[in-house]
Amino acid sequence: MTIEICKKLHVLIVEARFYDGISDALLTGAVSTLQKAEATYDIVTVPGALEIPGAIAFAEKNSKIYYDGYVALGCVIRGETYHFEIVANDSCRALMDLTIHKHLAIGNGILTVENEKQAWARAKQDEKNKGGFAAQAALCMIALKKRFGEIIKYG
């Protein structure tokens, strides 16, 4: 996507702050990518990964601001209970449902990892930079959506 196209884009970043430091690293990567693309953005914060899809749905349905796309940022670290599977699966499924059923361009940067070491390796901008990757994915999906037209019809 060219910078001229990106300059006209406005993106909403929805970040879960359950792990503050990891969230900061993911956000830094996402913001850096959007700034390099010269896209504008807003940021909202939610308590955890399960709340991210709801925030995106609220913004899409009720916001007076139009967002071309969304970046979902958060981290789910496996614990001793089944809660990890619920949060990891349901947050991802809800984002996919928004993409498929509401035709939203979403970059998914919700980390699902075994431990904090894996989370840091994926969150840091100088390592795997998954926040930046999620922002880039959102920009790519926005471009694809625009290529096929804002109104997508399924045959």
From Swiss-Prot:
Catalytic class of the enzyme: transferase
Annotated residues for binding of 5-amino-6-(D-ribitylamino)uracil: F18, A49, L50, E51, C75, V76, I77, N108
Claim: Glycosyltransferase is one of the keywords in the record: no
Listed GO biological process terms: riboflavin biosynthetic process
EC number(s) reported in the record: 2.5.1.78
Reactions catalysed according to its record: (2S)-2-hydroxy-3-oxobutyl phosphate + 5-amino-6-(D-ribitylamino)uracil = 6,7-dimethyl-8-(1-D-ribityl)lumazine + phosphate + 2 H2O + H(+)
CDD domains in the record: Lumazine_synthase-I
Membrane-spanning segments: none
Keyword Lipoprotein attached: no
Binding site for (2S)-2-hydroxy-3-oxobutyl phosphate: E80, T81, R122
GO cellular component: cytosol; riboflavin synthase complex
InterPro entries linked: LS (IPR034964), LS/RS (IPR002180), LS/RS_sf (IPR036467)
Family that this chain belongs to: Belongs to the DMRL synthase family.
HAMAP family: Lumazine_synth
Task performed by this protein: Catalyzes the formation of 6,7-dimethyl-8-ribityllumazine by condensation of 5-amino-6-(D-ribitylamino)uracil with 3,4-dihydroxy-2-butanone 4-phosphate. This is the penultimate step in the biosynthesis of riboflavin.
Record NCBIfam families: lumazine-synth, PRK00061.2-2
Protein name from the UniProt record: 6,7-dimethyl-8-ribityllumazine synthase
Species this chain originates from: Bartonella henselae (strain ATCC 49882 / DSM 28221 / CCUG 30454 / Houston 1) (Rochalimaea henselae)
Gene that produces this protein: ribH
